[in-house]
Amino acid sequence: MAALRALLPRACSSLLSSVRCPELRRFASGANFQYIITEKKGKNSSVGLIQLNRPKALNALCNGLIEELNQALETFEQDPAVGAIVLTGGDKAFAAGADIKEMQNRTFQDCYSSKFLSHWDHITRVKKPVIAAVNGYALGGGCELAMMCDIIYAGEKAQFGQPEILLGTIPGAGGTQRLTRAVGKSLAMEMVLTGDRISAQDAKQAGLVSKIFPVEKLVEEAIQCAEKIASNSKIVVAMAKESVNAAFEMTLTEGNKLEKRLFYSTFATDDRREGMTAFVEKRKANFKDH
C-alpha cells in the first residue's frame, strides 16, 4: 500500500517528494485527466487502454489518480465498443505504491470515519475483464492494484512486493488477502513480514503472473490478449469472469451452483445460440452481445 522511500533508491525517494503534476491529458469523453492517459486500441477499438502517468513519482497512487482511474474505468465500462481493458504504467514503474505524503499525518479517527482507501477497489467491480501490464516496480498499493485486475502480464524486469511493514504499517487495500490467495500462505507471509520483493520470474512460478514478456513487448501483448477476449460475447465473458472470481469467495459446492446457474443463463442469450450454430456450421461466430 505504500510508496517506499525505504525500499527505493534515494534518488527515487527525493523525486517522490518533489513531484510536479504532468500536463493535462484529454480523454475521448472530453474529461481532463492529470494523472492518467487513456485511449482505445485494437483493430475495432475494442480495447480500452489506461496508462498511469506520474513518472516523476514512479506512479505513486495519490487520491487524484485513483479518482481519475475510476472515472476512466467507468467510461470504458459503459462503452459498448470496448470488450476488455488494459491497465499499465511506465517502463520503470507500474506503480511504486501509495502517496506517502497523503498518508503521513492521518489519524485512526480520520481513516476510520472517512473509510480511507475504500474507493481503491472500484476496479474489482468492473464487469469487463481488466489486464494489468506490469513493468518495473509494483510495490505496496501498486501490487495491490495489479492483483485487483483479472489477469497480470509482467515485463521481464518487473518486481512485486508488499513492503508496508518497513513503514510501520501493513497493506490496507487487499494485499494480505489477495496475495495469500495468489501465491499461498508461506510466500505471502514472508513478503508481508519482511517487505522483500519477488521478480517477475518468481511471481510467475508462484502463480501471481500468467505470462512474462520483454519490456518493450509487454503492452502490445496485453492488448492482443484483451482484443482476443473482446472478440467473444461481452455478456458471456462477464458471466465467465463472475464465475471464476466466485471461486475465491465461495465454497466448492456454492461455486459449482453459481457456475451452473450462469451456464444455464447463457442459454437465454442469442450469442450462445450463434456460437453453437457457428460451430456446427464450421464458421466463425458473429456475436452481437445479447
Swiss-Prot record:
Binding site for substrate: A98, D99, I100, K101, G141
InterPro entries: ClpP/crotonase-like_dom_sf (IPR029045), Enoyl-CoA_hyd/isom_CS (IPR018376), Enoyl-CoA_hydra/iso (IPR001753), Enoyl-CoA_hydra_C (IPR014748)
Alphabetized CDD domains for the sequence: crotonase-like
UniProt-annotated location(s): Mitochondrion matrix
Modified residues (N6-acetyllysine): K101, K115, K211, K217
This enzyme's EC code(s): 4.2.1.17, 5.3.3.8
Residues under site feature: Important for catalytic activity: E164
Modification type N6-succinyllysine: residues: K101, K115, K204, K217
Annotated Pfam families: ECH_1
Processing and modification events after translation: Acetylation of Lys-101 is observed in liver mitochondria from fasted mice but not from fed mice.
Keyword Metal-binding: no
Pathway(s) where this gene product acts: Lipid metabolism; fatty acid beta-oxidation
Annotated family: Belongs to the enoyl-CoA hydratase/isomerase family.
Record text on subunit structure and interactions: Homohexamer; dimer of trimers.
Protein name: Enoyl-CoA hydratase, mitochondrial
